[in-house]
From Swiss-Prot:
Keywords: Cell wall, Secreted. It comes from the Eukaryota. It comes from Solanum lycopersicum (Tomato). This is 40 kDa cell wall protein. It is found in: Secreted, Cell wall. GO terms for cellular component: extracellular region. The keyword Secreted applies. The keyword Secreted applies.
Amino acid sequence: GPVEIYYLQSADAKG
């Protein structure tokens, strides 16, 4: 989810 992007930058982001 959009939250993970900010915290992990991996879950939904390209990480």
